[in-house]
Amino acid sequence: MTVSDAPTPHIHLPDGSCCQPKKFAHLHQHTQYSLLDGAAKLKDLLKWAKEVTPEGQTPALAMTDHGNMHGAVHFYNYAMGMEVKPIIGYEAYVVPGFGTRRDRSRAQDGEKGIFHLTLLARDFEGYQNLCRLSSRGYTEGYYYKPRIDHELLQEHHKGIIAFSGCLGSEVQQLLMQGREDDARARLLWYRELFGDNYFIEIQDHGLPEQKKNNPILKAWAQELGIGMVATNDGHYVKKSDATAHETLLAIQTKATLADENRFKFPCDEFYVKNLEEMQRALPVSEWGEEPFDNTAHIAELCNVELPVGKKRQYQMPQLPIPEGRSMAEELRVQTYAGAVKRYPAHLTEGLLRDYAARSLAELGEADAARVLKRTGGCDSASCDLDTLYTLLAFLGSEWEARGKEAGEKYTPYPALEKMEQDGESGTLPAYAHADCRAARRQDSDTSIELDPDTDDEETTRSHHRYALKLLRRAEYELSVINNMGFPDYFLIVADYINWAKDHDISVGPGRGSGAGSLVAYAIRITNLDPLEFELLFERFLNPDRISMPDFDIDFNDARRTEVIGYVQEKYGTDKVAQIATFGTMASKACLKDVARVMGLEYAKVDKVSKLIPIKFGKSYSLEQAREAVPDIQQMLAEDAQLLEAYEFAQKLEGLTRHASVHAAGVVIGREELTNLVPVMRDTSGEGQVCQYDMKSVEDIGLIKMDFLGLRTLSFLDEAKRILRESGTDFEEKYGDFDHIPFDDEKTYELMSRGDTKGVFQLEGAGIADASRRLKPRRLADIIALSALYRPGPMENIPTYVRRHHGIEEVDYDKDGFPNSKQWLEKILQETYGIPVYQEQIMQIASEVAGYSLGGADLLRRAMGKKDAEEMKRQRQLFVVGAKEKGVPEDEGNKLFDMLDAFANYGFNKSHSAAYGVITYQTAWLKANYPVQFMAALLTVERRDSDKVAEYVSDARKMDLHVLPPDINRSSSDFAVAGEEILFGLYAIKGLGESAVLRILEEREKAGAFKSLADFCSRLGNKVCNRKALESLIKSGAFDAFGERHQLIESLEDALEDAAGTAEINARAQSGMSMMFGMEEVKKERPLRSSIAPYSDLERLAIEKEALGLYISGHPLEQHEGLREAASCRVSDLDAWFALQNVAPGKRQKAVLAGMIEGVVKKPTKSGGMMARFILADESGQMELVAFSRAYDRIEPKLVNDTPALVIVELEAEDGGLRAIAEEIVSIEQLSEVPKVMYVTIDLETASPDALGDFQSVLDEYAGSMPTYLRLETPEQFVVYQLDHGMGSPEAIRALNQTFAWADAHLAYDQQTILGRFAPKPPAWMNRQQGGGMRA
């Protein structure tokens, strides 16, 4: 039958109208959010869908991912931007029946299986019901998949269009089982539920099951009057993507393409077909035009408008506040009350009563009367302080209303303006003198220090002006916040922060640009005075840029969940959720995944992966790397299989790989979240998580809060506890860390030495070295250092250091800014003429070019985005504005260029200042209370044995004693005993938390344990099994009772004695002993003294077994030569590698010393052998790999618990280092290597005269040892070998005693080590003869 002879198809649509022929839209399409199943990236998919849309038809596309709606908002936004109509849906997992979603038993037959059902939102109510269905699938029905059942469909079917589904649907599966009557009954159930919104879905991918089922479905459609719809179950974009999709499925199932039994699609037809291809699959001669035309009509019916973009309405949560006030007024009340506490010397009662009185006068009689009526008639003179704050809040509302009515951008405050004018003219109110006198008698609340011996008029005037400046800043910020509609946000954040503080949960001083707000400081959201640190409010909230404020809040990471719990309890668990985040297939990992499933040799792909550049911490895309790296181009040109893998990886790169929970983001809704977004369960199965990512929840209007966990706050809390329990004077002198002095000499000395292990932000070897070179003298230096030590601005560190030390002057004339230097000098003074902060860009634009600070913030953002048209406009504004201030056009352009270049890496000063304070606090603690500092540090890191080992090593350098656990002295965690640190019982492996608590409880109740037998009799097997008892002995916890080997061998005796004692006690309790007039006593047997004590190495070995690290010593201490021969310690290896400036994809030789542990040997695919092992020194440990080329050579020396020197090749890998073992040098071999004298000289602090003295000392104590001099400046170093050997032990001692800027020590000649033992000539030997640039 030809097309023209085909019968007119039955068209059944909800509104009964007919479709136009020759139309088609894809309504069953999976995207990248069908995780590791959909290989269609949203933008590629929408672009192609638009291309295959029949001419004259509005492009439309449905998104129907498996079980979730993760990508709905992104899909909607991209589609609207690309002029494609978005249809939001999802393919639900259905278990038939009512309440069956809660059934967790495995499927026994088809009815208990999980089936597919295609659902589309017809309107916003339908969208909401999809959110509810998908959510409840996760929260109530999750069992392998997020499942819904017929009960949920009955509850939430309104506004939804449903299709009968693919081969995985209930109807089709029943047909495939030969149960035609059941399939028909199921079809009718759905038809009755959805009515005219139900369609029979027809697909044909050439599969035999479809050929069998489709005629039956067609017959039922015609018989029952149910419309048919043609779909293609798309999983990728184009037919050519089928193999890439097959590869993706293999990655998901961890299979290889060579595995014939792997899960795969049956054909390559699951792509976005054009109408012609669809009609070839479903010929019009057989199906008519109905299945195609219906797709277009359904697309017309689906009209969901999401509240995004300009239609977005913020869903601010409802916070209970006192009756009779608006949210804006409540914020004002809290701000005034808080500001008075923050600035008691300036924002005084007298000032505020004067301000209120003047404001009432400015209002006029009628309006003033109305305001006073709201306060119960109390005026500014008669009201109490709380009512005064309320009065000021009501007055603020009046001025804001007047400002809006007049169309003012910023609220005018006439009374404040007159007070400022009086202050400038010299007219001072009476209270100003009293306030200034009172301020002299108390600690300053600002950086302004008043001289108690002076009482002149000018000082009083300055004091009063500053008070007015504070009041002006508060009023300005309040007007901006309230006019932008965000008072609720500030109050909500302040509520949970103050709850945390009131419950002794540490909160950070601020983070991000929010620290620039005085209102936030007043209501205790932040703890940083923005005026003292010269922070800009406009960097945070800008009336020229309407966007939600965003406070990032740090909490003690151990108690962060308590704060989230408080918010859930306050607003309701159904209104609070964390936010999803999605991991994508990044370039390097994606290439390796594809290569694995294709069976490519790992080494080959690994080599390409390592050539992919990393910029600012982010890898290039595969396309960028291919264009930028000639070596990659060459390797792909020479290897067809590698090229194929690379191109498949390019197709898969960027696809969504997995969903997880965002580290900080929490949303709080005004109403139940599922009215707006779908949710799912977190990994614990308790809390709920939005299915959308952070950008999507913000786009749709939900309010996002950031609850960040900061380990350093846990550390500071732990330190406070230890300081208190160890009897220090800390609390008496300072109260807490917010009140320590910022001018402590010992703290700056510590940072100047680079002794910053464990100090927040200064922990790494690189930044510790930068701190040593900078030698900070003030908090501003610490703030700048953390901002500078990042890719990009790091290149300015040498200049900053030179200017800081007075070696180099700032010269704006020489730099080309003679006419703008009057402003630059002021703005860049604290950073020595170097732009470091984003706020400085804003200040320069404001001062030099006349921008408002709001406009300057827009300039800063434009520079960051590099929009060519916007930059052209901004340049013109800047140059013209600067010209009006007397800056020539060429200088204005040059200044604009400097700011533009800096904008790429400028740092947020508010964030840097807040974190700089925490840096200082931790450094101050280390400098002033080192024992407590280290005990707290070890406690918070106790679960990371590598970190504990590193810090124990640092403690030894500080001459602190870290002792093994002691059963009678140790607490649960690390504790201070005098000037020593005791290991906690929690650190002992095999000893559970409950056992530790029982031990401490027994010790508290019945006193110290007297012996091993006493411990066993009091606690015995009920609390500690034999393995736990052995761990206690091996850790050293029972050292007070005897030698460890003797204790181990006597354990059985002690357990038997304990059992005997228990039996005697039982008889005593029953009264049997007393019946015979006798009292039994079980005598404890002594330790087996005939057992030989452990050797030092044996003792250290069992100590490490029990604690995960060596405490009472280290095996390397007996082999000092090994440590001298190493390039660096294990924990410093990353920093050492960075200093070598190794090119991407290249390797660097190094020499490491340590104990060989955990050797694992295994065969390779090529038939050889390889090994992996751990190398551990006092600072930590790392894994090494020995490939087959080195294996035979080093295998005899791969013996566990053996000290050795290992020559390795290092290469950068995925943000870390991989170490490949090339050779192992034994102790005996090392004894043949001569030692050298190595002297590091700091040229910054060594004067030319002192260098002459150095030569004299060297001559006086000269020996014959080869000698190397390493001469250092802040930006580079050079190593020289002296022509004649002059080193000697005496010279080393004399040089170190005489010159603070010289560090002389013995070392092995690494040239000799590498030349003699390395399998090939080392690449780094030439560096000894030349200079090396610092990273």
UniProtKB/Swiss-Prot annotation:
Keywords, ordered alphabetically: Cytoplasm, DNA damage, DNA repair, DNA replication, DNA-directed DNA polymerase, Nucleotidyltransferase, Transferase
GO cellular component terms listed in the entry, alphabetical order: cytoplasm
UniProt-annotated stretches for the region Disordered: 442-461
Matches recorded under SMART domains: POLIIIAc
InterPro entries tied to this protein: DNA_pol3_alpha_NTPase_dom, DNA_pol3_alpha_thumb_dom, DNA_pol3_finger, DnaE2/DnaE/PolC, DNAPol_HHH, NA-bd_OB_tRNA, PHP_dom, Pol/His_phosphatase_N
Keyword DNA damage: yes
Disulphide-bridged cysteine pairs: none
SUPFAM superfamilies: PHP domain-like (SSF89550)
Subcellular location: Cytoplasm
EC number: 2.7.7.7
Residues in the signal sequence: none
Source organism superkingdom: Bacteria
Enzyme class at the top of the EC tree: transferase
Null mutant phenotype: Essential, it cannot be deleted.
GO MF, one annotated term: nucleic acid binding
Pfam family membership, one: DNA_pol3_finger
Family: Belongs to the DNA polymerase type-C family. DnaE subfamily.
Known partners and oligomeric status: DNA polymerase III contains a core (composed of alpha, epsilon and theta chains) that associates with a tau subunit. This core dimerizes to form the PolIII' complex. PolIII' associates with the gamma complex (composed of gamma, delta, delta', psi and chi chains) and with the beta chain to form the complete DNA polymerase III complex.
Function: DNA polymerase III is a complex, multichain enzyme responsible for most of the replicative DNA synthesis in bacteria as well as the bulk of DNA synthesis/repair after ionizing radiation (IR). The alpha chain is the catalytic subunit. Following severe irradiation (7 kGy of gamma irradiation) genomic DNA is fragmented. DNA is progressively degraded for the first 1.5 hours after IR, in a step promoted by RecA and counterbalanced by DNA Pol I and Pol III, followed by massive DNA synthesis and genome reassembly in the next hour.
Protein name: DNA polymerase III subunit alpha
Organism of this sequence: Deinococcus radiodurans (strain ATCC 13939 / DSM 20539 / JCM 16871 / CCUG 27074 / LMG 4051 / NBRC 15346 / NCIMB 9279 / VKM B-1422 / R1)
Biological classification of the source: Bacteria, Thermotogati, Deinococcota, Deinococci, Deinococcales
